[in-house]
Amino acid sequence: MTILKVMLMAVLAFSALTGSLFTPAFAAAPAKYKKELSAVATAYAPGPHDNGKWGNLTHIGTQVRPGIIAVDPRVIPLKSKVYIEFPDGTGKYAVAEDTGGAIKGNRIDIAMWTVAEAYKFGMQDVKVYVVE
């Protein structure tokens, strides 16, 4: 196998794990969307520390991973694709696959790989665009 093929496979594997290839932090806000709302965003990680007895699973039974958010399904329906715009002007796409006891109204919880990443994210005021 050539070095180029090995490097390409490594990049694709990393991107698949992190979702970074498909949800870049610099993605543009959607031109068309179903709903726009201001929300408070926090972050969480898989495992009992942040996700309690559900561990690594979301409300719909998928794995907690970057690219997933927890929502109040009365505000953002489960399985919706959303675009999240952060205070610094960057944004990313995510899918609503989880819920949470503290996630009520205009709040979202963004999945991260680690608890340290979730703590670093903190709490931010964001704009959320429901795309599909």
Where do the model's predicted regions map?
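Solvent-exposed, well-ordered loop and adjacent helix/strand elements within mature globular domains
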Residues: T2-M9, G19-L21, A25-E132
